């Protein structure tokens, strides 16, 4: 009875996603790539980074680290699956300018450094530096609330709130 009355012991399905990069937060529809802008990979936001560091947006586990180190997948404790894709068409760089600081299966806390990258090199060699942050299991989410139009600080600015079904 007290558990229900005071919410004690209840597991929350809500996850706060903090900015994995420092920069301007934009609507996912502003990404100059139809796959991300059309939400085909999932709903979310994008950040135009001002520095070359990606941190974990949640407490969770690294479920995928692309061998080219340009993209990483994290699973939050509530089941939210987050893909961070640094820049557009960066896969063609074949890992040049990217360094991973974590490995698959590793537990991480919000704010832990995941990837560092050469922002100038991406500007020079890729289509864009804009970085989509998407919820890949959007169909399992009850709601995704985004915060756009702000300048985010990595590891602290809330950019999404995801409630799972």
Curated annotation (Swiss-Prot):
Annotated site residues (Important for phospho-donor activity) in this chain: 70
Co-factor binding comment: Binds 1 zinc ion per glycerol kinase EIIA-Glc dimer. The zinc ion is important for dimerization.
Record PTM Phosphohistidine, positions in chain: 85
rRNA-binding as UniProt keyword: no
Cross-referenced Pfam families: PTS_EIIA_1 (PF00358)
Annotated Zn(2+) binding sites: 70, 85
GO cellular component: cytoplasm
Gene Ontology biological process terms, A to Z: phosphoenolpyruvate-dependent sugar phosphotransferase system
Subcellular location(s) of the protein: Cytoplasm
Keyword field: Cytoplasm, Kinase, Metal-binding, Phosphoprotein, Phosphotransferase system, Sugar transport, Transferase, Transport, Zinc
PROSITE patterns, sorted: PTS_EIIA_TYPE_1, PTS_EIIA_TYPE_1_HIS
InterPro entries: Dup_hybrid_motif, PTS_EIIA_1_perm, PTS_EIIA_component
Classification via PANTHER family: PTS SYSTEM GLUCOSE-SPECIFIC EIIA COMPONENT
Complex formation: Heterodimer with glycerol kinase (glpk).
Domains as described in the record: The EIIA domain is phosphorylated by phospho-HPr on a histidyl residue. Then, it transfers the phosphoryl group to the EIIB domain.
Protein name listed in UniProt: PTS system glucose-specific EIIA component
């Amino acid at each position: 009875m007290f558990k229900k009355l005071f919410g004690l012991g209840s597991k929350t399905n809500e996850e706060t996603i903090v900015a994995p990069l420092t920069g301007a937060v934009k609507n996912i529809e502003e990404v100059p790539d139809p796959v991300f802008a059309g939400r085909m990979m999932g709903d979310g936001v994008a950040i135009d980074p001002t520095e070359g560091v990606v941190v974990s947006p949640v407490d969770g586990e690294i479920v995928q680290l692309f061998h080219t180190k340009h993209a990483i997948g994290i699973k939050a404790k509530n089941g939210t699956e987050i893909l961070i894709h640094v820049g557009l068409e960066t896969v063609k760089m074949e890992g040049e300018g990217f360094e991973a600081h974590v490995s698959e299966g590793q537990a991480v806390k919000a704010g832990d450094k995941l990837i560092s990258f050469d922002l100038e090199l991406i500007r020079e060699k890729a289509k864009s530096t804009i970085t989509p942050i998407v919820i890949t299991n959007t169909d399992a989410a009850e709601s995704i609330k985004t915060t756009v139009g702000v300048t985010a600080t990595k590891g602290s600015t809330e950019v999404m709130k995801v409630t799972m079904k």
